[in-house]
Structures are given as structure tokens and as C-alpha cells.
């Protein structure tokens, strides 16, 4: 085969890709759970996120733009520090789009726990962008916004 001949087109299994993307999104959300194993769950983000990934918080505030480490560090302190207990995040509903080696999950999520003795809860939307790597699907970017006065999710 000459260097100019193309190899056979790859076969994409969209159902398997959707399942793998869903697994990555679930692992991302599951990382935000308080308790003794929270450092291990958060550490998994270091392989789930590309090293150059960007994470952006909007929430009606000045943008919070984080690289991987600046995103993980304060969450490690909060989730393992004891002031936030019984905390977890989970998806409510979402849509997965896949095309070749790129994918996106856009969906609603919820969170709840007890912070400094007071119940806390919220909902919002997350946009998760993923790319296929030799190691599997990895997150390249995340952005989120939470409900607040004037901005609410429909019943999920």
C-alpha cells in the first residue's frame, strides 16, 4: 500500500459511544460526593479530563474559569473537609450528541447536601464536551449554570 492510499474507513458504533460518553458524564458528576472516598473520586477527574481541559462556572456571577488543578483543589478541600456532608450531584435529564471523535452532553443536574449544619440543594444545567482519545472518551470542556431568581429549570 502506498503512502497515499487510504485505509478502510473506521466503523463508528454510535450506541457504544453514547454509552461511553454517558459513563464519563456520570463519573464526572459522581466525583462531587462528600465522604471518605471523595479524594479518590476527585483524583479520577485528573484522567477523565484532558490535561488542557477548561471548566467554567457562570451562575450569574463573574465567570470562574479553571484549569484541571484549580478546579479540583477547592472541591477536594470542601468535600473532604467535613463542613459539607451528605453531598452529591446527579443528572436529571440530558442529551448526548456524537459525531465521529467529538461528543457533547447537555443536561440538567441536581445537587444536595448539608453545609455547616444547614441543608443545601440546587439544580442547573451542564454542558460537557468530550473527545475520543486512544484511552477512550475524555472531557475537554465543561460549563455550568445554576438556577437562580428568574432562571429556573422546567420540572425534571
Please annotate each region the language model reported.
Residues 67, 116-119, 148-156:
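A short, polar/proline- and glycine-enriched secondary-structure boundary/capping micro-motif
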Residues 1-48:
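Short, low-complexity N-terminal intrinsically disordered segments enriched in polar/charged residues
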Residues 91-96, 109-111, 125-131:
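Hydrophobic/aromatic beta-strand elements that line small-molecule binding cavities or substrate pockets
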Residues 81-84, 111-121:
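Short, cysteine-centered beta-strand-loop-beta hairpins and adjacent loop/turn segments enriched
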Residues 2-5, 104, 123-150:
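Short beta-strand edge/turn micro-motifs at domain boundaries
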Residues 28, 45, 53, 105, ...:
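Hydrophobic pocket/interface hotspot
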Residues 42-99:
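A solvent-exposed, acidic/Ser-Thr-rich amphipathic alpha-helical stretch
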Residues 87, 99-111:
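A short hydrophobic beta-strand element
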Amino acid at each position: 500500500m502506498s503512502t497515499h492510499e487510504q485505509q478502510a474507513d473506521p466503523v463508528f458504533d454510535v450506541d457504544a459511544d453514547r454509552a461511553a460518553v454517558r459513563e464519563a458524564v456520570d463519573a464526572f458528576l459522581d466525583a462531587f460526593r462528600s465522604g471518605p472516598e471523595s479524594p479518590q473520586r476527585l483524583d479520577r477527574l485528573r484522567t477523565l479530563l484532558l490535561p488542557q481541559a477548561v471548566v467554567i462556572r457562570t451562575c450569574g456571577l463573574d465567570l470562574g474559569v479553571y484549569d484541571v488543578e484549580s478546579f479540583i483543589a477547592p472541591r477536594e478541600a470542601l468535600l473532604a473537609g467535613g463542613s459539607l456532608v451528605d453531598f452529591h450531584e446527579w443528572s436529571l435529564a440530558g442529551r448526548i450528541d456524537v459525531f465521529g471523535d467529538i461528543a457533547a452532553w447537555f443536561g440538567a443536574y441536581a445537587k444536595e447536601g448539608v453545609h455547616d449544619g444547614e441543608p443545601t440543594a440546587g439544580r442547573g444545567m451542564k454542558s460537557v464536551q468530550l473527545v475520543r482519545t486512544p484511552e477512550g472518551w475524555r472531557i475537554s470542556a465543561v460549563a455550568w449554570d445554576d438556577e437562580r431568581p428568574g432562571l429556573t429549570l422546567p420540572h425534571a
